[in-house]
Amino acid sequence: MIIDTTEVQAINSFSRSESLKEVYDLLWLLVPIFTPVLGITIGVLVIVWLEREISAGIQQRIGPEYAGPLGILQALADGTKLLFKEDLLPSRGDIRLFSIGPSIAVISILLSYSVIPFGYRLVLADLGIGVFLWIAISSIAPIGLLMSGYGSNNKYSFSGGLRAAAQSISYEIPLTPCVLSISLLSNSSSTVDIVEAQSKYGFWGWNLWRQPIGFIVFLISSLAECERLPFDLPEAEEELVAGYQTEYSGIKFGLFYVASYLNLLVSSLFVTVLYLGGWNLPIPYIFIPEPFGINKTDGVFGTTIDILITLAKSYLFLFVPIITRWTLPRMRMDQLLNLGWKFLLPISLGNLLLITSFQLVSL
């Protein structure tokens, strides 16, 4: 059987085109997955660098300066060092719980990014229950911390895990009515709809002015959820050595710090989305001159502007928890629980009742 050379070339060309098509399909499948991961990683590195520089300025000392320009790669160098350190395991601990705990803490926080809109319809999952899905997912992280403390077979670690669980429960409850109040004002639980509801009146339409009490309660509760000073009781050095992190080393030890900064960035982004207008500018788009083109919500330029506005608001807000860490002393455990249960919870419930009454009257 004689095969024409032209037919062989056509078959080879078809095979190459099919192979290229499969490669392109694989790339288009991986790009949406790795792009958010890369962006989140860079965001965490920037937060670590900002905190080190600000703390150095407050303490009148020189911050990181050798790893990269202005020391911006210091966090990456520290992470690489932890990656190659020995992973020690407690001899009498529960190895499975000890190993799974850090992963649960990080993964549960990473899932929260799926409902955060960085721009107009630029969100991984635009769900009708977006904000409440975030609350449900964030409740999983303390389970990982409790597993880490219990699996370490160490009294300091276990005490730190119990404190983390108690603190999360105490401040998750007052945080939920604040989110519910925002949902009532916006007539939706979707994060995209909440931002759109704030865009009607520009700067004065932000929920920051319509819900000042809820904003303060949300701010305090989110700081406690992130276990930042003055709420870092689960890992208080003077009392618990390092809390649930005491027995950890290597990359597992680093995962706890990754989870902490991821949670801080999530909280800042949700403050931006719920109270600071999301990707909207402080003034309505109609007042911006047409040559700037910012009033165009579609296209690459409009999407880039939306992302930059969201990130700018979030990183400006990050100065609050960073400065708070180096300003206020640590609270006692009884003060922490009293603040959550006896002060913030009644205020948030009263605020929710007030908003519900206004909404019923306006019907």
Curated annotation (Swiss-Prot):
User: Superkingdom of the source?
Assistant: Eukaryota
Quick one: a GO cellular component term?
Answer: chloroplast thylakoid membrane
Q: Where in the cell is it found?
A: Plastid, Chloroplast thylakoid membrane
Keywords of this entry: Chloroplast, Membrane, NAD, NADP, Plastid, Plastoquinone, Quinone, Thylakoid, Translocase, Transmembrane, Transmembrane helix
For this protein, the Enzyme Commission number is 7.1.1.-
Alphabetically, the GO molecular function entries are: NADH dehydrogenase activity; oxidoreductase activity, acting on NAD(P)H, quinone or similar compound as acceptor; quinone binding
Main subcellular localisation? plastid
Keyword S-adenosyl-L-methionine in annotation: no
How it assembles, according to the record, is: NDH is composed of at least 16 different subunits, 5 of which are encoded in the nucleus.
PANTHER family in the cross-refs: NADH DEHYDROGENASE SUBUNIT 1 (PTHR11432), NADH-UBIQUINONE OXIDOREDUCTASE CHAIN 1 (PTHR11432:SF3)
Q: What is this protein called?
A: NAD(P)H-quinone oxidoreductase subunit 1, chloroplastic
This protein's species is Calycanthus floridus var. glaucus (Eastern sweetshrub)
Q: Which gene encodes it?
A: ndhA
